[in-house]
């Protein structure tokens, strides 16, 4: 009888101990779990950083756009130059390229930085991914409320004053629009490229994704819609322009880029 009394608890404790020792992937979060980054291998290999939108309502974290060097009209270009501009009481949790740019690394779409409009909303037709309509804008107000809005819808909101962006970056195409994959994406598409994008998701988090292998637009959009549960998601860029800084998972791309989006944390 003594054996029957003590065997189950001991085995349960052993199983719990073994379970606790098992690796949980490459997920690493800060102490408050406001953000985390990890590397995933399904449905394809990708790196993702999650940000709890509620964290932006406090004073410890801020989502920002960066473009030019301080007191200069020269673009920052790299994560290293951005890091050098941050004050000693702040650190860059993670960052990625924020959208498409011209030959001078200036944004080609609507851009607002700290309430100042850098580039007006671009509703013109054209070629390339940016003009694969509908495209959209990731934007947030001074209160840290983040949205991804289709460009024509945002145009109407700007006219009425409903939208008052403190930061904004326009890119395209939209990946997911109101829970629907972009209508021009082909499930059998054969154009495979490295891609990065961002989604505002139903669990209250933002998902910043950088594919670590070439994928189609449809595959990339499906990740946001089906796995990450993002009703709205926006393509930022791809190929050689796709860049990620996430030191918690040993990611630090050295590429040149235009506008950068990043999460800044105040040091305790």
Please give the residue ranges for each predicted region.
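Short, solvent-exposed aromatic-acidic interface loops
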Residues: 67-72, 152-157, 211-214
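Active-site neighborhood of phospho(di)ester-bond hydrolases with catalytic His/Asp-centered motifs
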Residues: 95-97, 233-236
């Amino acid at each position: 009888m003594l054996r029957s009394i003590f065997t189950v608890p001991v085995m349960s404790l052993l199983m719990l101990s073994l379970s606790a020792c098992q690796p949980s992937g490459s997920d690493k979060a800060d102490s408050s779990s406001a953000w985390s980054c990890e590397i995933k291998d399904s449905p394809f290999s990708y790196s993702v950083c999650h940000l709890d939108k509620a964290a932006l309502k406090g004073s410890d974290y801020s989502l920002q756009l960066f473009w030019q060097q301080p007191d200069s009209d020269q673009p920052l270009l790299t994560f290293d130059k951005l890091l050098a501009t941050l004050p000693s009481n702040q650190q860059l949790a993670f960052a990625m390229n924020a959208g498409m740019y011209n030959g001078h690394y200036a944004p080609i779409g609507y851009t607002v930085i700290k309430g100042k409009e850098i580039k007006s909303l671009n509703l013109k037709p054209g070629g390339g991914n940016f003009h694969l309509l509908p495209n959209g804008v990731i934007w947030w107000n001074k209160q840290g409320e983040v949205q991804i809005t289709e460009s024509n819808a945002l145009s109407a909101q700007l006219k009425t004053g409903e939208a008052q962006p403190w930061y904004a970056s326009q890119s395209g195409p939209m990946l997911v629009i109101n829970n629907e994959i972009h209508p021009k994406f082909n499930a059998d598409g054969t154009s495979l490229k490295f891609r990065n994008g961002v989604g505002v998701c139903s669990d209250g988090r933002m998902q910043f994704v950088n594919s670590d292998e070439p994928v189609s637009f449809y595959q990339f959009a499906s990740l946001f819609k089906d796995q990450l549960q993002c009703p709205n998601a926006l393509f930022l860029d791809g190929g050689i322009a796709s860049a990620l800084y996430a030191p918690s998972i040993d990611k630090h791309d050295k590429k040149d880029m235009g506008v950068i989006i990043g999460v800044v944390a105040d040091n305790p």
